[in-house]
């Protein structure tokens, strides 16, 4: 798989990126449930007549208000129904890519007939949990996903257990590539980006290809809140300058508009999130184009952005009350700073300023308004880079920012992992009361 001469640590970095940066069609929380339903349907004897599903509170939060691609409908029930009737059980986060018009119509009919239910799993200690049970008469099949959007841990039918994931790693098995990130630093990541052979990371250019196509769709269609298209119109009207700063925000938010509005184009995700992938990709692409960067330079900047975003997010719960577009934008800040300046000091200063700026942004579920937060995060990232280029940054004398960027990241992630859990519960309670 790798050149045998490649640094083993670098191999783990590349594996981590390949594991966390993947194409995804539709918001990944509803898609996780759709995948569970699709796999269950593949195990069922006969056509699906009824769907029952249970999800964690966090997954419910991120599925209440998001449009499922191709359906024009929001919410988890349509995702579960379409996954069961038209999903590709082998396609992972692109489970709905082959859904036909007939499958969509059948899913809507199943929903209208009251044959689909989605409830919160109680009790539930897992942050990311989805279980789908499909029925044909008295026959049934059930699939459970835990911990990761595609991490199937249990498959069972009326005939018995088909599959159960082993909880422990046996001797001889390799640890997850993500484990290495808990033992690395941004400085080591930068060394990797500067020195790794281009051929080993060329694949990351696919993130630019997919997310640029999504951005163009967002600008040409009436998706979501159409923030990108609206800002572009304001440039034409003379109310907003058409410059590098506005281009970063417009093209990044346009991709999120299309993503959250239900466009049937995949995003290249990061850490299980399309919006995080968009945020880690598009600002870097825009700046690279501005400076006329070639493919190799773009690939190195994208690798720094995506790997830095993964590195930070690996210290967070998979889902939390912290809007992770902000942490993905910290990766983007690193990638943009590298393109302009290349120095570790500039990169670390930009990330520190980001932590001092947007770290309080909450995640109140996946919806069209995510594009607002994506645009805010992208704008903050470029502002932080501009400050760092002038040797200015939020310092360790201010707020949760420390004198060392690694400690600043740890402080932010500690907030999200511990004290913001109560915030998360309050957000879920508010959203649940609206849905009643």
From Swiss-Prot:
Domain of life: Bacteria
GO biological process entries: L-cysteine catabolic process to pyruvate
InterPro entries, A to Z: Ser_deHydtase-like_asu, UPF0597
GO molecular function list: L-cysteine desulfhydrase activity
Classification via Pfam families: SDH_alpha
Family statement drawn from the similarity comment of this UniProt entry: Belongs to the UPF0597 family.
Protein name: UPF0597 protein YhaM
Species this chain originates from: Escherichia coli O6:H1 (strain CFT073 / ATCC 700928 / UPEC)
Gene: yhaM
